Regions:
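Sec-dependent bacterial lipoprotein signal peptides
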Residues: 1-25
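Subset-of-secretome marker
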Residues: 27-259
Length: 259
């Protein structure tokens, strides 16, 4: 794994947590009034996530990625991501998180990331020695996770940006509850933050605008599912689905041995 790709990978977990924080909902009482404004539904998620303090998530990735060969984009053999999994835990108050990624179709690739005490530890056994590497975390992101007021301000600003366009979809059933369905777009420019992430993508992949769909319980607003459709130009499209659970359960996240 090249250094730009490894740096991008170590930043992916805090970014993912920030996105989850922006769009997760978990607040409540039995007489919660119905919400109709998609922005209000997402704003309720900030307060609810802070109230829960911890959560578990499990996800899958599907789709195909075609890398470039000989400088021609999209000419390589397709890599199928079906069966890939993502599992992790988040402790917002403790500013800690862990995630494990498995891609069976890519030589059994596995990756682990642990963010704790302002340090991000990364391990990708398929590359290098298989040991842990460490890098100072992005303090502003870690600090924002435990600051509801700041997240509310960031959310309001994000939803008003051009191209984001949050909107309501038809309500759906999610398990034993009815759920709001809200969609919005994360423009590629918001993800890349310039050219650094794009430059780190391998094989001529080109990140496009990401379509996000969320399911939020209507009885006591709480996010239960997320779906990200990630276009990669001629390199294909990847869908990542996440399901959140175990809100408020005890979580133990510590620096890895040898990290």
């Amino acid at each position: 794994m090249s250094r730009p790709a490894r740096v991008a990978a170590t930043r992916a977990l805090p970014a993912l947590i920030a996105v989850l924080a922006i769009i997760t909902a978990a607040c409540g009482g039995p007489a919660t009034p119905a919400l109709s404004d998609p922005k209000k539904i997402l704003e309720a998620g900030i307060a609810g996530l802070q109230e829960a303090k911890t959560f578990h998530f499990e996800g899958t990735a599907n789709g195909k990625v075609v890398l470039s060969l000989g400088g021609t984009t999209g000419t390589g053999a397709p890599i199928t991501l079906d069966g890939s999994t993502l599992i992790g835990d988040v402790d917002l108050a403790g500013k800690r998180a862990s995630v494990s990624l498995t891609v069976p179709t890519l030589f059994g690739l596995t990756a682990d990331v642990v963010a704790v005490d302002q340090v991000v530890y990364t391990r990708v056994p398929l590359f290098g020695s298989g040991g842990w590497t460490r890098q100072a975390g992005t303090g502003s992101i870690f600090d924002a996770l435990a600051d509801p007021a700041r997240l509310l301000d960031q959310l309001a600003a994000f939803l008003d940006r051009p191209g984001v366009a949050p909107k309501n979809l038809s309500n759906e059933r999610c398990g034993d509850a009815d759920c709001y369905a809200v969609s919005f777009t994360i423009p590629a420019a918001e993800v890349s933050g310039g050219a650094s992430l794009v430059a780190a993508l391998p094989g001529g992949l080109a990140l496009g605008d990401i379509a996000v769909t969320t399911l939020v319980r209507t009885d006591a607003p709480r996010l239960v599912k997320l779906s990200f459709d990630v276009p990669l130009g001629p390199g294909g499209t990847v869908n990542v689905g996440l399901e959140l659970s175990k809100f408020g359960d005890p979580v133990t996240i510590t620096p890895p041995e040898g990290g």
